[in-house]
C-alpha cells in the first residue's frame, strides 16, 4: 500500500464522505466466502486480427472521420487500410507484457482467406487464386517473437477459403501444415486452434458457396486428425460461433446454426468455444435497426446482463453435445464491427469488468478481448499506443484477481454488482470487486481492514480514468505508474457513484485461498 501522506489522507476522507444512497448497506465476509470454481491462469486473453499482421482494410476509427460525420452503415468507408503491424515496438511489448500471461489469438474473419507463403520472398502483389491476403514468413515470425516476448501462448485459426480445397470442395491441410511446420522450425508453439473463424456466419467468412453443416462436418473429419499429427499437444477449440442466443439477431444461415454444426461433427473438441457481441456498432447496426446500442444504455442491467444470457445459450449446447468440456469465450468486445465511439472510453469498463467477473462465476475459463491494439474497441490506441480505460481495468484484474473464484455471499442490486476471487498469491487473501453502476454512492460494511483500488472518471465518456483520484498514464516507453491501494479500516466503506472498486483483504484467512 502507499505510504501515508496528506494527499492520500485527504483522498481517503473524500471517498469515505461520499453521500450514500438510502439503500441498505451490504455486509461482506471475506473470511468465509466459499469457492465456486476456478479459471485458467490466462483467463484474460486478447486478439490480434490476422489482417493486422498482413496489412489490409480494417474497421476505420471514428476519429478518422470529419468532425460530426458518421460512417455510412455498410459502406466501403467503414474500412481503412493499415500497413502490417510493427510488433517490435518496445512500448507495445511492455504494455502487453504487463497483462501476461495470456493467450494471443491471431484469427478473425480475414484469417479464413489468408495464404501462408512458405518462402522467404516478399508477398506477391496479388494473392493466389482462392485467397484474399498473404502472410509471409517474416510477418509470422514477428508474431511468434512477439508472443514469446509478452508471455503469450498462441491461438490461431486456419485458412478455409476456396484456395484450400480439392476438386470436391473438401478442405485440404497443405496450407495449415506449412504454417505449423514453420512455426515449429523457429521455436514457436501453437497452443490452441479453432478450425475457422465463426462457421455459423460462413457466408460472411469466405467459405465456399453453399457451405453447410454437412460440409463443415466433412472438413472437421479431415482437420482433426491433421491437428493431432502436427500439434498433438494443441487444444482443439470450437466451433467458435457468434451472434446466437442473444437479443441481437443477424442473418445466420439456417443450415449453419451452431446446433447443426455440433450434430455434424460429433464430440470432437477439447474446448467448447464461442464468440460474443451483445450488439453491433454504429458502423453496421445503423443499417439494421434494433441491432445496435447506445452509450445511455451502457450502465443498464439489460446491457450488463446480456453476456450471461448469451453464455447460457452456448453453455446449454456445450452440455448437450460436448459435456464436461471447458468453455472459452475466444472473441468479444463492446460491439461487433470495431466497437462504438464510447467503447474506447471509461463507460465501457463497467461492461468489461462485469462480463469477466460474471462469466468467471459461470465457469468460463478464458475470455479473449478483441482487440489488443486495432480500432475503437482496442485496449490500446492503435496510433499512439496510449492505454485506454479498459487497459487499466484489465491491468487491475491481472494484478488483483487470482484464478480461484469465490461467491461474495452478499446480495446487492440497484446497480451494485459484487464479485470475489482469491488474490493471485493466495495465502488466504481475498479480492472483492464492487461495481457501482448506479447514479448514487453505495455503502459496504466489512469486518476487516484492507486496501481499495477505485476507478473513476470525470465524465462517463472520458478517455482517461483515475485510480483513487489520480489519472493513470503510461510513460513514453510503456512504463506503468505505481499501482497502489489505499488503506481502509474495518467498518463502513463508501463506493462512489459510477465507479468500480477492487477491495483487497490480506488478512482474510480464507481457507479456499490457501
Where are these regions (language model features)?
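Anion-binding catalytic surfaces of enzymes that hydrolyze or transfer phosphate/sulfate esters
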Residues: 266-278, 282
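Bacterial N-terminal signal peptides that target proteins for export
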Residues: 1-10
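Non-catalytic accessory regions flanking glycosidase/transglycosidase catalytic cores in CAZymes
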Residues: 15, 22-255, 259-271, 312-315, ...
